[in-house]
């Protein structure tokens, strides 16, 4: 039976069955990748969304979970924020939400999307304390019909708070991508995020530098607005991989407002950078798990 889903039914399920469902679903996700940042304003969600779209463009089955409960914007960035969410009732009485999908008119393998941004009006704040946030994230993991995925991408809120702990304690991440900018203040907080992932024993940790430089649209020269090389130096210092630099792209704002990932604008520097980063990530994870290259 399929019915329209209400808002998250937080009190309705016991912790044990929900935890079990998460564990069962996790078995169907080949690679689980978190995208996080030590501070806000570095373009973390932009990286998460475009990494997701790049992987789907490569032919992989991808889901993205927006774990930023208080500031969800993944759905809008993928153009599905107005999609209605339906749920299916199971024999034991629990409901599972059916995630909307984005395929951008067949340009990518359909992406499964789940975010609180599809469940509340845009101007309505979500004023929840830690316990409610924890339960919501667990339900987004365990009470959604994710199915089999090559990649589960989880977009964390900035910082090192409850949401991150909840996910890391609920599933076994394969990788953590930490997003920074070249600015010194961003790099300080990025180091904290890297060390948190180390303490959580995430097998593969890498840094991506966003807003690395601007290509002047008039003269074509490269302009290092926020400095140069900070992300790469930090990765070297922390002993983690550096996956690449993403330039400031003047089309990115337009793409984001339209709900189209910039990676689908194939002739742009940012699109090329995202594709290269996605390819590096795939190769690293396959090497780590001993998988053969996808045909």
Swiss-Prot record:
PANTHER family in the cross-refs: IRON-SULFUR PROTEIN NUBPL (PTHR42961:SF2)
UniProt-listed SUPFAM superfamilies: P-loop containing nucleoside triphosphate hydrolases
CDD domains: Mrp_NBP35 (cd02037)
Domain of life: Archaea
Keyword Iron applies: yes
Role this protein plays: Binds and transfers iron-sulfur (Fe-S) clusters to target apoproteins. Can hydrolyze ATP.
Sequence similarity: Belongs to the Mrp/NBP35 ATP-binding proteins family.
GO term, biological process aspect, one: iron-sulfur cluster assembly
Any one GO molecular function term: ATP-dependent FeS chaperone activity
Entry-linked InterPro entries: Mrp-like_CS, Mrp/NBP35_ATP-bd, NUBPL-like, P-loop_NTPase, YlxH/NBP35
Assembly description: Homodimer.
Residues involved in ATP binding: 38-45
Pfam family, one: ParA
Species in which this protein is naturally found: Pyrococcus abyssi (strain GE5 / Orsay)
Record key words, sorted: ATP-binding, Hydrolase, Iron, Iron-sulfur, Metal-binding, Nucleotide-binding
Protein name: Iron-sulfur cluster carrier protein
Keyword Cell membrane: no
């Amino acid at each position: 039976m399929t019915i329209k889903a209400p808002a998250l039914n937080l009190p309705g399920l016991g912790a044990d069955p929900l935890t079990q469902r998460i564990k069962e679903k996790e078995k169907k996700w080949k690679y689980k990748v978190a995208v996080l940042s030590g501070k806000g304003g570095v373009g973390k969600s932009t990286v998460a969304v475009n990494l997701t779209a790049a992987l789907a463009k490569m032919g992989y089955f991808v889901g993205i979970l927006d774990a930023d409960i208080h500031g969800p914007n993944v759905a809008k960035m993928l153009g599905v924020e107005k999609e209605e969410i339906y749920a299916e009732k199971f024999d034991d009485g629990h409901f599972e939400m059916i995630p909307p999908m984005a395929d951008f008119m067949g340009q990518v393998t359909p992406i499964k999307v789940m975010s609180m941004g599809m469940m509340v009006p845009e101007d309505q704040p979500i004023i929840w304390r830690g316990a409610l946030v924890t339960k919501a994230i667990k339900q987004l993991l365990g009470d959604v019909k994710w199915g089999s995925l090559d990649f589960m991408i989880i977009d964390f809120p900035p910082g090192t708070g409850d949401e991150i702990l909840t996910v890391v304690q609920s599933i076994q991440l394969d990788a953590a991508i930490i997003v920074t900018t070249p600015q010194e203040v961003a790099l300080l907080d990025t180091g904290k995020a890297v060390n948190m992932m180390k303490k959580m024993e995430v097998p593969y940790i890498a840094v991506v530098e966003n807003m690395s430089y601007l290509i002047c649209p008039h003269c074509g020269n490269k302009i290092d607005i926020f400095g140069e090389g900070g992300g790469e130096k930090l990765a070297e210092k922390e002993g983690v991989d550096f996956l690449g630099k993403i330039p400031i792209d003047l089309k990115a704002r337009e793409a984001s407002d339209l709900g189209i990932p910039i990676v689908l604008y194939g002739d742009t520097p940012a699109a090329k950078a995202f594709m290269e980063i996605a390819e590096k990530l795939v190769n690293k994870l396959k090497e780590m798990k001993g998988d053969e290259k996808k045909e």
